């Protein structure tokens, strides 16, 4: 399966060929109408901070807590993240640093510079030098089950069963 952040051939464009379904948030600029989607859950944003940061001891982080800090944000990570990124840039109190993907190199560099990273919680606890703290920003990230535009009968039955469970 292709790298999720490879613009030439994304996982979403591999649906129906290499994979049947994918659980993920959604990025309109990256995936457009490449697949169908079924909303399964909403998850909160997290701010991943170095364990040595004073913010690491907080139970929640607000925009005010981030004033004057550098915050790494995945560009086109998902539509909700893009919207939050625009608001943070407009506010001007947080130095937003665009990144292209999440990997250990990103977190290593962020730790060296004392930067925070905006995530949906999936990276929380993955890098040993970081802790994820819920971000009170008034929005959540919808997570979807993505499936092909023309699913096989088995995939459509699975999607229908998921939809029934979610209702």
Describe the predicted segments one by one.
Residues 31, 69-92, 155:
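Secondary-structure junction motif
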Residues 27, 76, 122:
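Flexible loop residues that form catalytic
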Residues 1-29:
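Central regulatory/effector-binding core of bacterial HTH transcription factors
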Residues 32-38, 42-43, 105-154:
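Beta-alpha-beta core module
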Residues 14-24, 45, 94, 110-118:
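Alpha-to-beta junction loops
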Residues 64-67, 142-167:
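Extended ligand-binding regions for polar small-molecule ligands
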Residues 34-45, 49-71, 156:
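Flexible hinge/capping segments at coil-to-helix
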Residues 1-6, 73-74, 92-104:
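Short beta-strand-to-loop elements that line the ligand-binding cleft
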């Amino acid at each position: 399966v292709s790298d999720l952040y490879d613009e030439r051939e994304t996982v979403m464009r591999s649906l129906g060929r290499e994979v049947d379904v994918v659980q993920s948030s959604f990025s309109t600029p990256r995936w457009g109408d490449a697949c169908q989607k079924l909303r399964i859950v909403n998850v909160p944003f997290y701010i991943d901070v170095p364990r040595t940061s004073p913010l690491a001891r907080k139970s929640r982080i607000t925009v005010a807590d981030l004033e004057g800090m550098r915050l790494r944000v995945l560009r086109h990570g998902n539509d909700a993240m893009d919207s939050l990124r625009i608001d943070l840039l407009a506010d001007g109190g947080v130095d937003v640093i665009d990144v292209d993907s999440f990997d250990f190199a990103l977190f290593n560099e962020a730790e060296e510079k004392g930067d925070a990273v905006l995530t949906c919680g999936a990276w929380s606890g993955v890098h040993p030098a970081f802790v994820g703290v819920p971000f009170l920003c008034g929005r959540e990230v919808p997570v979807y089950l993505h499936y092909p535009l023309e699913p096989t009968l088995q995939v459509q039955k699975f999607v229908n069963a998921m939809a029934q469970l979610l209702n």
